[in-house]
A protein has these predicted regions:
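Cleavable N-terminal signal peptides
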Residues: 3-4, 14
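Sec/Tat signal peptide C-region and signal peptidase I cleavage site
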Residues: 12-18
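Short amphipathic, basic-aromatic surface patches that mediate peripheral association
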Residues: 21-33, 56-60
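Structured domain cores in non-transmembrane regions
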Residues: 45-115
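Glycine-rich, aromatic-bearing surface loops/beta-hairpins
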Residues: 98-103, 111-167
């Protein structure tokens, strides 16, 4: 019966990988600070939307008032946001404080499980009430045949955005 462990290995996905996306929200020296709304998604090189990974916004405002400012993340709103029913299960979350926040996805996550072989971007967009807006793209290829890290550095609303893939 030593065949079963070997069969289990053969049944594993051919390109299993863990994907980590870290987003730094910098401390800003402003009179009135509001935590930014942040959207993270996957797009093709032609900027067509593939999948949403996270949307951080004010979930707890009465009468869903927090949803009103989602459109300030203009690219997210145009690509996919306006067609979504919020909150989105498994995607929506509360705004985050200053610091670095890491999201981890395995190969079974719906966004990566059916992702065809090809080149893509992880897109991170941030917008802040009484503040600015910033968008960063981090290119990657899927599936990954070796471990790698790619990053982009923000200038205002975002700090370092880093994506690492570990097959």
């Amino acid at each position: 019966m030593r065949v079963l462990p070997l069969l289990a290995l053969l049944a594993a996905p051919a390109f299993a990988a863990d994907v980590n996306v870290s987003v730094e929200l910098p401390r800003l020296d402003v009179a009135e600070y509001h935590k930014p709304y942040v959207a993270i998604w996957i797009e093709q090189p032609n900027q067509s939307h593939v999948a949403n990974l996270a949307v951080w916004y004010d979930l707890k405002m009465a009468n869903k008032e927090g949803e009103k400012w989602l459109k300030d993340m203009r690219q997210f709103w145009r690509r996919t946001g306006r067609s979504l029913e919020f909150p989105v299960d498994g995607v929506s979350g509360a705004t985050k404080a200053v610091g670095t926040h890491t999201l981890t996805f395995d190969h079974n996550h719906p966004a990566f499980k059916t992702l065809p072989k090809g080149d893509y971007n992880i897109v991170v967009e941030a917008a802040r009430e009484v503040g600015g807006r910033e968008l960063l793209r981090v290119p990657f290829s899927w599936p990954a045949d070796k471990a790698y890290t790619a990053e982009a550095q923000g200038k205002t609303e975002l700090g370092l955005v880093k994506m690492s893939v570990t097959p």
